[in-house]
């Protein structure tokens, strides 16, 4: 008998049947129509308990990629989740505050019972991307995927297999999806020769690569947010923890830090953010992508008015002035020369110069410079929005320079200019994924080039690490718990033909809970468990609190869903490495082993894992605030930075060399100093005559990136809307709630307008993560910003310039 197809035309209705206290699925498929994915009416109500069994309350977590991991108390009756609440234990005092979930985590029941859950293994039929699948058994899936994987390795080598970026499950031990090297998929691949890995991530690519050239190492540390209690002034460049970290511990930490000393908070951002609402004293609107120009002008005032910390600069840095330039640096290449217009560009970085670029009045720039330099101490930090631009690497270093110039590095109440430290962590043992035999890496963003034109990808043209050039195209993609095949990637319309061509990338395996926009490109679509359907634990920390949430298996997996561990074990069996993969253990037995190891480091944990699951949450308070680079500040000779010089490298010889040896595209630049580089499609671009509005994105209460994007409860509470200033709306005849067309040369998206003075004129913002929902003409109908963004990687990090876009907006 021919197996039924799941198509966009012939949709089969889901039925929930309760038997023996467990949810089972009738032999039907969930809707897979792109048009239905986001429709509230398409989401089925959770089933009702059928019996009179006793209700249980079990601990679990919301472990998506918002920066917080929050506790859930899950009410279960007759094998059905009836209600989800959050942490309500203890007295909620500061230092041991409750790990309260936001509306997203509290909507977990709708996510569990969403009609878009993948019911069983599916195999593509027809053309890739067409949305046609047929049901197969797990045995068929394991066998065919194993054969495809072995064939790819035998034909092209292990570098042709890529683990794509996915952050749908973070913080857990067995089920985590990021970083790829920490996942069960990585363990499987490492047992059969390894895989092509990536570096950096979509959240922080430019700052991760760029800012270490200032401080050294692979990641620049910051003081804990709680240390802001010791600050006289805090200056947030694009940092919005009230929205990006609105749940868990951070909201209370931010409030406590702000009001303990009554620290003054200035927020520099194109938007009047929720952080401005909750803790801000003054909003300074700034045009996107111009933070480096503002930083240079602030430095100009500090230098000309002798407000800098000269002893700090002399002792801890190189490259500030001509006398401290490293050997081989050309004359006139110091930071001071650049700022004063004595360098190659001969342009003094005055407040008037910066005002034309940033839109900030010169007098306000002058005042801000004096405020920062005069505060004792000043907490200077940046979120990850400013760096997500075409030249964001330089922006990250330029903001960091303000902390360096004022000597606020390594002291209480100061900071490095980076984002605040994520907090203490508990030493919980993790699932061992073994060493990857393949050492080649590419950027998390430019993997599509390795499908389309791998021969052009070298160390100097594409940032390849581990070898001089790629030796194979990507032919096999693992996409576990991620929506970056398309939805979260830049240039969706340009990505589409690359993914459709199955002669280029021959196999795409999507392992997920939900039929996301990325799932339509799958050759094999495998249903994985949500964390409420398996045992695990989730650990995290924020400022002075570290914790672990023990995730109970609250219900049986819906349909035929399996844990990622069991999925990989099944494929490992086909490849002849199951014993090496499992070491004879089930997932729970692995957790017992890892828990026993964890108790050696944390003896206060309950004696058994079973008791830990009953307890639910373990917290530890660390009374000392974290001070980044304190040891370096106290004794730089004994505790040098991990930079080549051991000091803060204002002038970077390494970047000077890359500037000479790397091949860059027009509009791109790598500079030894943290200079302002105008962005193509930026604030002062000639293209603004045709596309007059700068488009950025922002994190949003409705979703964590794209996760929860199909939950209609959240869509009702926080609908997808384009933020537009009243001045720009009036000029276009747009009224609040109008459906508008947002477009440029890359794509079109339709969305409702939110007219608000909380965004500066000349700038519009779309909340990121909306599910791509194209109509028959290929136009997005759901406010998905990535049909408008670029597919062009940045110069140094080869990262995603998601906030460098010009668009036009008109009433639809």
Residue ranges and their predicted role:
Residues 2-5, 178-268, 293, 403-521, ...:
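Extended redox/cofactor-interaction regions of prokaryotic respiratory oxidoreductases
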Residues 273-375:
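Long, well-ordered, tryptophan-enriched scaffold segments
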Residues 280-286, 546-557:
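Short beta-alpha connecting loops at secondary-structure transitions
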Residues 563-612, 706-708, 712-723, 727-812:
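Long, contiguous, secondary-structure-rich segments that constitute the structural scaffold
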